[in-house]
């Protein structure tokens, strides 16, 4: 399936950006920590800063589609690694998307503040 990339240009940007590698690592890290991460305007951790840099290199149009691609990749990783089932897995996955949703705002991406991902992703795909 075309997945998040209905816009071919964005798929290309996603590949050029090495699938937003830093963002994937950041999403994974955040999702595996239960509890909310640091609040407020603390120093950005270096990994988050790298992720923001990746997003700033995208065209605004592609920020959400590429983030969605990154989220999906992380979701797959978690599924394979964890062997977690049901409830716990769903929580991790929803944290991935929650984190991704707000990244444009966290990173001050012009013209994009929140990516409209569904909060609850449908069951195993």
From Swiss-Prot:
GO molecular function: nutrient reservoir activity
Disulphides: 10-62, 23-51, 52-107, 64-115
SMART domains reported in the protein's UniProt record: AAI
Entry-linked InterPro entries: Bifun_inhib/LTP/seed_sf, Bifunc_inhib/LTP/seed_store, Napin/2SS/CON
Record has Disulfide bond as a keyword: yes
Key words, A-Z: Allergen, Disulfide bond, Seed storage protein, Storage protein
Subunit structure: The mature protein consists of a small and a large chain linked by disulfide bonds.
Family: Belongs to the 2S seed storage albumins family.
Function: The small, basic, water-soluble napins are one of the two major kinds of storage proteins synthesized in the seed during its maturation.
Protein name (Swiss-Prot/TrEMBL): Napin-3
């Amino acid at each position: 399936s075309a997945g998040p990339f209905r816009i071919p240009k964005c798929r290309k940007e996603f590949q050029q950006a090495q699938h937003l590698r830093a963002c994937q690592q950041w999403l994974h890290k955040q999702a595996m920590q239960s509890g909310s991460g640091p609040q407020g305007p603390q120093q950005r951790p270096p990994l988050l800063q790298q992720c923001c840099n990746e997003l700033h290199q995208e065209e605004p149009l592609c920020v959400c589609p590429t983030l969605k691609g990154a989220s999906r990749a992380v979701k797959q990783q978690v599924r394979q690694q964890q062997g977690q089932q049901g409830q716990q897995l769903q929580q991790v996955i929803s944290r991935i998307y929650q984190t991704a949703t707000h990244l444009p705002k966290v990173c001050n991406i012009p013209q994009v503040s929140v990516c409209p991902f569904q909060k609850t992703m449908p069951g195993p795909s």
